[in-house]
From Swiss-Prot:
The keyword Coiled coil does not apply. Keywords: Acetylation, ADP-ribosylation, Chromosome, Citrullination, DNA-binding, Hydroxylation, Methylation, Nucleus, Phosphoprotein. Gene3D superfamilies: Winged helix-like DNA-binding domain superfamily/Winged helix DNA-binding domain. It comes from Bos taurus. The gene is H1-2. This is Histone H1.2. CDD domains: H15 (cd00073).
């Protein structure tokens, strides 16, 4: 009995895993159903635009075109009628004959051109925004550059006192030179006086000449 008892719980886990696999398989199937194809309104507009009839496309001709495109007309008959009504109310299609979904339908050219124009306007409006953004960036760049100019100017102001100090030193130096010149002149005058005092010394040999021994 001890050998058969652990075999029962070992068989239970695979039974629990199987429903998880089934759920995982169901999710992609649901996603495929949703993304089976484009909506009915797009198919109707394409079929009406492709037709060359001036009076418009009838419901029977529209169903044939949808069936040729691979759309299940029998199952989605109510959706086709609702799609036609919604497109007429929006203005994308114009009903040329009949009432409701039983008449003939034609593509509204004014609505098609009107839809194209707002897109072009939006694209044109988007460009000035980018230009405005670029202008803001340039303004920010210039605003950031102005402090640099002020920073450059401040050292110049600091340099001016240094230049003034140099001029003061230059102004003081001539005074020293002027004060030094009189000293040199005094020395030269003293030197000039000394030779005058030396002249009487030359007369001494004359006194010694008359002496006789």
């Amino acid at each position: 009995m001890s050998e058969t008892a652990p075999a029962a719980p070992a068989a239970a886990p695979p039974a629990e895993k199987t429903p998880v696999k089934k759920k995982a398989a169901k999710k992609p199937a649901g996603a495929r159903r949703k993304a089976s194809g484009p909506p009915v309104s797009e198919l109707i507009t394409k079929a009406v635009a492709a037709s060359k009839e001036r009076s418009g496309v009838s419901l029977a001709a529209l169903k044939k075109a949808l069936a040729a495109a691979g759309y299940d007309v029998e199952k989605n008959n109510s959706r086709i009628k609702l799609g036609l009504k919604s497109l007429v109310s929006k203005g994308t299609l114009v009903q040329t004959k009949g009432t409701g979904a039983s008449g003939s339908f034609k593509l509204n050219k004014k609505a098609a051109t009107g839809e194209a124009k707002p897109k072009a306007k939006k694209a044109g409006a988007a460009k000035p925004k980018k230009a405005a953004g670029a202008a803001k960036k340039t303004k920010k760049a210039t605003g950031a550059a102005t402090p640099k100019k002020t920073a450059k100017k401040t050292p110049k102001k600091a340099k001016k006192p240094a230049a003034a100090a140099v001029t003061k030193k230059v102004a003081k130096s001539p005074k020293k030179a002027k004060a030094a010149k009189p000293k040199k002149a005094a020395k030269s005058a003293a030197k000039a006086v000394k030779p005058k005092a030396a002249k009487p010394k030359v007369a001494k040999p004359k006194k010694a000449a008359p002496k006789k021994k």
